C-alpha cells in the first residue's frame, strides 16, 4: 500500500513502516464517524446529508402511584402518568396556553404531521388565554421557548380531544419528555440510554418501543436503587419509520427520575 506524507509532499520509500487509519463511511463513501473527542461533530453540525442526530431527555419529579409512568413532566399530574398514546391516534391542530399571564413570547413545536413527516410550528403565547395553531399534528416530539424569555409558568399543549400531549415546566424553557416517534422515511438507530433514580427506593426503568401498527414492548431497561446507569450499544438498536419510543418507570410513589437517549436518524432513500 503506497503512503503519501502531506508535510513533505512525497511518497514513502519501500520498506517504510506502514500505518493504517480506520474510518466509518456511508454507502456513498462519505466519512460519517472517526474516533476521539471530535468523532461526531460533523453529524451534530448537520454536515452529513441523510443523517440526523437526535438527543431526547425527560424528568419526573415525583411519580404518582406505583404503576408504570412515562418519564415526562406530565407524569407528575394524577391521570397523566402514562403518555396518552391512544388519544393521539387522530391528528389534529393543537392549543397552547400558560398558567401565567406573563408568558407572551414564542413557543416552537417540533414533531410529525398527518403523514408522519417532520414539521415545526411557532406559536405566540398570550398568557392564560389559549392560542390555537394552524398546523395538524400527529406527534409532538419536542417543545421549547423560542422567543426572548424563558417561560414563567407551565406551558401546556393540548390536541383536539382535548388531551395534554406536551408540557414545558415553569422556568425550564424546554419540554422534558423521554419519548419520541421516528419520522416517516427514516430509520432510527439507538446508541445510548441513560437512566437515573435519585431517591433511596427501588425502581425499574425500561424503554418501550412500538413499531407502526404493532404493540409496545420492552427493548431494554434496568433496576435502580438511588443510582444511575448508562447503556452503550456496541451495535445500535434499529427502529423503523413511525416507531413510537417511550421510556417508563415503575416503583414506589414519589420517585424522582430522569432518562435520556441518543438516536441517529438515517434517510431510507
Stretch-by-stretch model annotation:
Residues 1-35:
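Short, low-complexity N-terminal tether/leader segments at secretion or assembly junctions of large
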Residues 2-9, 34-139, 146-269:
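Beta-strand-centric surfaces of beta-sandwich/beta-rich domains
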Amino acid at each position: 500500500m503506497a503512503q503519501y506524507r502531506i508535510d513533505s509532499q512525497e511518497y514513502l520509500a519501500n520498506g517504510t513502516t506502514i500505518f493504517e487509519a480506520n474510518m466509518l463511511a456511508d454507502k456513498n463513501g462519505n466519512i460519517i464517524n472517526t474516533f476521539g473527542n471530535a468523532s461526531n461533530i460533523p453529524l451534530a453540525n448537520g454536515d452529513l446529508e441523510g443523517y440526523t442526530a437526535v438527543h431526547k431527555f425527560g424528568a419526573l419529579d415525583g411519580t404518582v402511584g406505583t404503576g408504570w409512568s412515562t418519564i415526562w413532566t406530565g407524569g407528575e399530574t394524577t391521570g397523566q402518568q402514562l403518555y396518552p398514546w391512544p388519544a393521539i391516534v387522530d391528528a389534529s391542530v393543537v392549543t397552547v396556553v400558560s398558567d401565567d399571564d406573563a408568558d407572551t413570547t414564542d413557543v416552537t413545536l417540533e414533531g410529525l404531521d398527518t403523514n408522519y413527516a417532520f414539521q415545526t410550528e411557532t406559536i405566540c403565547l398570550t398568557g392564560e388565554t389559549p392560542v390555537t395553531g394552524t398546523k395538524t399534528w400527529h406527534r409532538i416530539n419536542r417543545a421549547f421557548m423560542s422567543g426572548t424569555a424563558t417561560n414563567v409558568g407551565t406551558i401546556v399543549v393540548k390536541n383536539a380531544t382535548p388531551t395534554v400531549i406536551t408540557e414545558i415546566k415553569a422556568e425550564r424553557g424546554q419540554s422534558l419528555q423521554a419519548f419520541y416517534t421516528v419520522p416517516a422515511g427514516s430509520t432510527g438507530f439507538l446508541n445510548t440510554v441513560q437512566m437515573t433514580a435519585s431517591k433511596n427506593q427501588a425502581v425499574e426503568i425500561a424503554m418501550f418501543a412500538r413499531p407502526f401498527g404493532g404493540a409496545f414492548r420492552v427493548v431494554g431497561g434496568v433496576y435502580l436503587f438511588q443510582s444511575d446507569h448508562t447503556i452503550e450499544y456496541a451495535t445500535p438498536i434499529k427502529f423503523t419509520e413511525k416507531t413510537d419510543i417511550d421510556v417508563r418507570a415503575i416503583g414506589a410513589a414519589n420517585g424522582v427520575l430522569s432518562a435520556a437517549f441518543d438516536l441517529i436518524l438515517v434517510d431510507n432513500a
